Amino acid sequence: MSTSPSRRTLLATGSALGGALMIGGLPASAVARAADEEPVEVTASPDAWKDVLDDADMVWQRMPRTWYEGPYLGNGFLGSGIYAEPGAETRAVRFNVQHSEVQDHRPEFGSLFGLARLLIGHFTLEPVGTITGLDWRLGLQDAELTGTITTDRGTLTIRAFVHATRSVLAVEVMPSAGERDFRWVFHPADAISPRTAYVTPPAGYRGNPPAEVADHDGVMAAVQPLLAGGQHVTAWRDRTRGAGRTLYVSVAHSHPETTALDRALKEVRVDSEIPYNALAAPHRAWWHRFYRKSFLSLPDARFQRFYWIQLYKTASAARRDAPVMATSGPWLEPTPWPNTWWNLNAQLEYWLIHGSNHLELDAVTRALSEFRDNLAKAVAPQYRGDSLGIPRATDMKLVDIVSGFDYGVGVPGQSRPTPEVGNLTWALHNVWLSYRHTMDESILRDVLFPLLRKAINYYLHFLQPGSDGKLHLPATYSPEYGGNSRDCNYDLMLLTWGCRTLLESAELLGINDELAPRWREVLARRAPYPTDTNGFMIGADIPYAKSHRHYSHLLAVYPLYELTGHTPDERALIEKSLAHWVSFTGALQGYTFTGAASISALLGKGEDALRYLGQLMGRYIQANTMYKEAGPVIETPLSAAQSLHDMVCQSWGDVIRVFPALPGAWRDLVVHDFRTQGAFLLSAVREAGRTRWVRLVSEAGAPCVVRHGITGPIDVRDASGTSLAYEEATDGAIRVAIPKGGSVLITAQGDRPDLSIRPVGPNAPAPRWGMPAK
């Protein structure tokens, strides 16, 4: 990211770029304005989405027994994971009731206990007979579970969804004659931090009182009072229509008020008056619109299905106005991590929203802005006037307090609280990505710049010159490695990106900031990233010498793209560091392999990226594409979708790279309306191992440099078919001016390919996700 004052001017004007102006592969001066051709239009049939989504449906012909095997439904707030009732696998099916806003409110016990998300409870669907079989399908296109449960007394035909825009779970059951007396039973959970099952709680901590279940004029409700005040409420009604019954369930949470009961009862009363199909219609329409914002088809059937399931999962777990996803999204299960985690998880959870063109799910930008006052309270009192931070784990309002302190982010050079300082700057990189992919200046002006300024200011309090004349950081903590180190790479890399971004942002916003000289000084004088013969170290005092799942010591490579291998020495350093990182076994986890895949994609190594993702699939991803360690964690499969994005398109450094890291087996590939930095929508088709065409639509009129990957002379045309002037850049890229709302189409010279968007054929068959029959 350049900080030159003339950078935007240089990118926007051909006269200063030094490349020859071209039309149709010839100098513009030698070519008259090309005659208008037929308008060029990229077309996509709705069947394209239907085909890939139907193909990606998860199926179950065997009973799922855990959260990482069964179907899941959600809308960013309300969720339900579905599987056999433990200990009664042939007698009942569990429908969990989960909600991302339901948490405790006792900060004196810290975020992991006193502010933990709380289990709510579950329904059991209890047939008359013994369950002997099932046939379920989670239809991605409609976000709806359908199928049958077979017993020795008959069948239960079910349909279920969590409404996309209403706070209701609806489950319709059509029983055969022998199963007419099936029943629903609600089982409230203990309202206590799930972490208590793994770690001894602080002294004085106890669970909340039991829930109170009562009938409210035909609507049942389980009211869970909270010791801190407030309540969460599960309300439900089992409504009979004709031969079927529909269960309507809603959850509400309030603190410190006790208004949740009225809200939950009202939701159920309103929704239960609506027949299932009528209630489902707007829900299905929402999902159809959601998917059609982008398209990706690749010839590996297993990976293509996995990708579309991650989009389904993300839209089930996230909304802009919902809490930032906790470690398990809305689907809370027993876990030692019942909060939102900020030293990797939250960042990875939201990466895929950018390329897939789903910024409507960006809760990170909204939450950091809305709760910025709590970010000030996260640092020690003497720094709150000009600094911000975010602790490792927080509740939905970004609050955490470490026992014995009134703040959660440690002080560099001090051991307690743990000086894990870089988390907010890393989270703000997600905000920067949202700005860059939309070019929405309000994000830059109102959120990124003011928050990043104070996040970096926290570092500036502690930088000190050494005997070498460089600026050094006192000891800080690199997530999860163990031990504090001076000049920790996690922090130096984020500090460097932050200062560079602040300088560029100030220029774009026209701000003459008094701190700009200090930011420039940091870039000029900060200590070099500590390295040894094996590559990047954890910090100056700690080599990378044991198995470690995090890539926090490699952030300058990915995702910051501060180091990209643009020189042979830099490339060798990245390759050496990557190889050394993954060479230690024992503590590696799933996101180790997504990080390794994305770093490989940066280096253009598509085969390596595919190999790392293959290891992830074979060793870590579960039957329903969920992922587990000591408890459920959602970030790794979602970040694997981002690794696929990184293989298909990269747009760091003001260059759009089309198909930069595809493995040889992916000879056919289609991408449509893929969002890139600069607010471009990319559509491109690869056939028989070569790129046939590239189309870019500009939403902001930003400068456009694209490495299109088409061999030989090219034609560049606008939407009307008129040839456009362009300039040759470096490494096979061209520079072309696209006005806001305009588009360009790039093809081989004289080639007029079919511009339809349709799925590619698979190289080989693959089993569906879920639990199909063996």
Model-derived features: where do they sit?
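Active-site core of glycosidic bond-cleaving carbohydrate-active enzymes
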Residues: 342-378, 389-393, 415-441, 446, ...
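Carbohydrate-binding surface patches
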Residues: 164-173, 679-705
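Carbohydrate-binding/catalytic loop surfaces
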Residues: 328-339, 384-412, 470-490, 536-548, ...
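Surface-exposed beta-strand/loop patches in extracellular or lumenal glycoproteins
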Residues: 180-189, 697-711
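Secretory targeting signals
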Residues: 1-5
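N-terminal export signals
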Residues: 9-31
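Acidic/polar, glycine-enriched structural segments that form the non-catalytic walls/loops
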Residues: 35-68, 73, 77-340, 359-362, ...
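Acidic/histidine-rich catalytic neighborhood
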Residues: 454-505
